[in-house]
Curated annotation (Swiss-Prot):
UniProt keyword Transcription present: no
Keywords: Cell membrane, Glycoprotein, GPI-anchor, Lipoprotein, Membrane, Signal
Protein name per Swiss-Prot or TrEMBL: COBRA-like protein 1
Annotated gene: COBL1
Residues that carry a glycan: N42, N167, N175, N214, N239, N254, N323, N338, N357
Covalent lipidation (GPI-anchor amidated serine), chain numbering: S432
Secretion signal span: 1-33
Protein family (similarity comment): Belongs to the COBRA family.
Main location: membrane
């Protein structure tokens, strides 16, 4: 009998560890390249050949951010590819390559880039007018499609030499890559499509590209970073419990080797403020917390009215190395179909499945709170949401008032476990009794095991 108890307890222990391991990593899988809240979201690169030249062609390359709520912030996108033959870039407008490469074999006019694998970036605002084209020169920053389609497009023009001069002799580039600004995007092979049609400014004449191909790039949070980037905490007026972000949501504090986070009261705080003129990707340097996340979203159920209920949403930045410009928040909750008012955020419903309206995107008001400042006294933005009650569904029981899912800047945030949500007082007692019975059962098993 004793052997049976020992063996079974060992099996249950191993089984429990296995379940915990699987649950811990279930949130970060390669399948996250498909986003159920934005199933058709992608970045599409369209390459239009506009005219032929003596040894190649002139093309306009347009980058469309068709993602509803994932934008590209500074220092912006970097687009790369491999030439199929020995092509060179003679000149560019609206963008530039990051390296020229070895052009020593050329005499006279030197190409803009001779690399087999060029990387192109957008020009910065304020670039000379003779180097600009339409939709260029925003430093590679692209807004999300839901926030502002007009600024979700970027373009550059390049003159390609040592290439084909007909549709049959041109070879499409291969191995496209997109950094925005870091990793996370996987690009498809270029696909030749029907030539793009252009409508004239007077809308009376239509021209078309000589040849067009498209590249589609999709995002995976699993590829973008090893750990999550945000977490969610919860509270309510009907329960004193404040549910914090789960411990180690975005990594654990390294106590043996200090330096992976900053104590806000420590002497090092003044030295970590980044140089605002540095136009390069800077990894997060976060405030020392139990959750170790760069960003925390707090959802507080604030007031219960007769026909309405109110929520306060606070976004706090714990990252000393990042100001989040044009930030956005996506929230999934069944009562969004009855959202009545947002007090200091912009709001737009997201309905990837037309019959279901349970998801909304929130973002800051321009020049007021569209910039989430770096960690510190000004590193937060907040708003309140007013929902109308739906008699058939509304309840404060069993955590119904809390969101099902939250995204910050397109990344899925770590939610607290459902059994930790603030419960109504009359149901909290049942939870306590259940926990008491579980503890008593565990003590009984230990007692029996010790006496057998």
């Amino acid at each position: 009998m004793g052997f049976f108890l020992c063996s079974s307890s060992s099996i249950f222990f191993k089984f429990g560890i296995s379940i915990i391991f699987l649950v811990s990593f279930s949130g970060l899988t390669p399948s996250e390249a498909y986003d159920p809240l934005d199933p058709s979201g992608n970045i599409t690169v369209k390459w239009d050949i506009i005219t032929w030249t003596g040894d190649g062609y002139v093309a306009t390359v347009t980058v469309y951010n068709f993602q509803q709520y994932r934008h590209i912030q500074a220092p912006g996108w970097t687009l790369g590819w491999s030439w199929a033959k020995r092509e060179v870039i003679w000149g560019m407008n609206g963008g530039q390559t990051t390296e020229q490469g070895d052009c020593s074999k050329f005499k006279g006019t030197i190409p803009h880039c001779c690399k087999k694998t060029p990387s192109v970036v957008d020009l910065l605002p304020g670039s000379p007018y003779n180097q600009q084209i339409a939709n260029c020169c925003r430093g590679g920053v692209l807004n999300s499609w839901a926030q502002d389609p007009a600024t979700a497009v970027s373009a550059f023009q390049l003159t390609v030499g040592q290439a084909g001069t007909t549709n049959k002799t041109v070879r499409v580039p291969k191995n496209f890559t997109l950094k925005a600004p870091g990793p996370g995007y996987t690009c498809s092979p270029a696909k030749i499509v029907k030539p793009t049609r252009f409508i004239g400014t007077d809308k009376r004449r239509v021209t078309q590209a000589l040849m067009t191909w498209n590249v589609t790039c999709t995002y995976s949070q699993f590829l973008a970073q090893k750990t999550p980037t945000c977490c969610v905490s919860l509270s309510s007026f009907y329960n004193k419990t404040i549910v914090s972000c789960p411990t180690c949501s975005c990594g654990c504090r390294n106590t043996s080797q200090p330096g992976n986070c900053v104590d806000p009261k420590g002497p090092r705080i003044a030295s970590v403020i980044p140089n605002p003129g540095k136009n390069a990707y800077i990894p997060p340097l976060v405030q020392c917390t139990k959750h170790m996340c760069p960003v925390r979203i707090h959802w507080h159920v604030k007031v219960n009215y007769k026909q309405y209920w109110r929520v306060k949403v606070t976004i706090t930045n714990f990252n000393y190395n990042m100001n989040y410009s044009q930030w956005n928040l996506v929230v999934q909750h069944p009562n969004f179909d009855n959202l009545t008012q947002t007090f200091s955020f912009n709001y737009k419903p997201l309905t990837p499945y037309a019959s279901i309206n349970d998801t909304g995107i929130l973002w800051g008001i321009k020049f007021y709170n569209d910039l989430l400042m770096q960690a510190g006294p000004f590193g937060n933005v907040q708003s309140e949401l007013l929902f109308q009650k739906e008699a058939s569904a509304f309840t404060f029981e069993k955590g119904w008032a809390f969101p099902r899912r939250i995204y910050f800047n397109g990344d899925n945030c770590v939610m607290p476990p459902p059994d930790s949500y603030p419960w109504l007082p009359n149901t909290g007692s049942h939870k306590s009794v259940g926990s008491l019975f579980a503890a008593m059962a565990l003590l009984l098993i230990v007692f029996l095991h010790g006496n057998l």
